[in-house]
Amino acid sequence: MTRSIVSLQVGQCGNQVGLKFWEGISAEHGIDVDGKYIGDRPDQELHRIGVYYNESSSGSYVPRAAMLDLEPGVLMAIKNSKRGQLFHPDNFAYGQSGAGNNWAKGHYTEGAELVETALDIIRREAETCDVLQGFQVTHSLGGGTGSGMGTLLVSKIREEYPDRMMCTYSVLPSPKVSDTVVEPYNCTLSIHQLIENADCVFAIDNEALYNICYNTLKIEQPSYDELNSLISSVMSGITCSLRFPGQLNADLRKLAVNLVPFPRLHFFAVGHAPLAASNSAGYRSLSVPELAGQMFDRNNMMAEIDPREGRYLTAAVYFRGKVSTKEVEDEMTLMQTKNSAYFVEWIPHNIKTSVCDIPAAGEKISSAFIGNTTAIEATFKRFGNQFRSMFRRKAFLHWYKSEGMDELEFSEAESNLADLVSEYQQYGEATADGVEGYEEEGYENDHPEDDEE
């Protein structure tokens, strides 16, 4: 039984990142722009194709995806692009007026009007799955649609499918790649929702993406397209274990069981290797130790954090290409032994490894990384401080109140974010004796029927 994932792309950023993701994984599965299979290794490429694609009666493979936005521009551009034929034409839903970078418009007014249409698409996709394992959402938290309507959809889906997994790829705003002054509001209100309604949040920081492009890839003025390509490469690496046969973390629930020690602490930093400027890429010998070193290097992480300022609760690493499983495991043991101060001692064996024979497009070997580190509190503190300095003066609040929002919701979001920061601090400093309830919490695997492939 194939256990499928339904994807939602919400807002401009979510749809542009989503399109890059589908381009990347279609190439890996041998699917052309019209959804036809043109690969040469069907036993590998098609074995679990049903996770992300639905096979139509004409034999083409259609992404299980809903494309959603509050204005038509980006979706029309996708529909008319060369990949436009890949998607189901009925799975595009858009409003006309946009959210104007206002979370309340996305969550309470404009977005609420479109949400029923969106849920119809999602139900229709869910019904075509043999077994639905869960949902993945790509969106940004800085604007109005991805943040406001994105989190509205997450909460509606949670109500309707309470026992399915909910994972989000959430792009956090940055002053270097900034669109709008109210980003701290939109971001904090969104995180407030994601703490309660998501199982796994891959936090991708525009600031870190910008720094990777500028410092490592030597791109003087990174475009959104280049930032999105970075996100799509890490999404492809993280999802390879879901899409190809015989892997650790072969579904979203197992991924969460391995990475989430306490239900609220489900915000992950992600990374990808190799990263090198195109003119120097040919000069490096890629080996497992080299990739491992790059993955754990703060300059390669897609979150603007310094892992040395916190401790890893858990981590998962995925190697792709012709690499030996034993070498990967030995390297990770060595990495953990050498850096034991940066891993909590009360979760033994907290780095999970996985090897996938099928390389990423254009790479001989590559790797992806997911880290649940307490250092991510720095990101939340950054938004919390920006939020506080505006909220104290009630700056721009009238834009939100005029859509029917209450100040109380702002205060609740602020205190939920502050609680999250202090929980990360508490577990970062805890010793083996000081942690209670670790065994009891986390995810019960109460869906044994899901484990059947």
From Swiss-Prot:
GO BP terms: microtubule-based process
Lineage top rank: taxon: Eukaryota
Protein name in UniProt: Tubulin beta-1 chain
Binding site for GTP: 12, 71, 140, 144-146, 206, 228
Region of interest (Disordered), residue spans: 431-453
Lineage: Eukaryota, Rhodophyta, Florideophyceae, Rhodymeniophycidae, Gigartinales
A cellular component term, taken from the record's GO annotations: microtubule
Record text on subunit structure and interactions: Dimer of alpha and beta chains. A typical microtubule is a hollow water-filled tube with an outer diameter of 25 nm and an inner diameter of 15 nM. Alpha-beta heterodimers associate head-to-tail to form protofilaments running lengthwise along the microtubule wall with the beta-tubulin subunit facing the microtubule plus end conferring a structural polarity. Microtubules usually have 13 protofilaments but different protofilament numbers can be found in some organisms and specialized cells.
Main localisation: cytoplasm
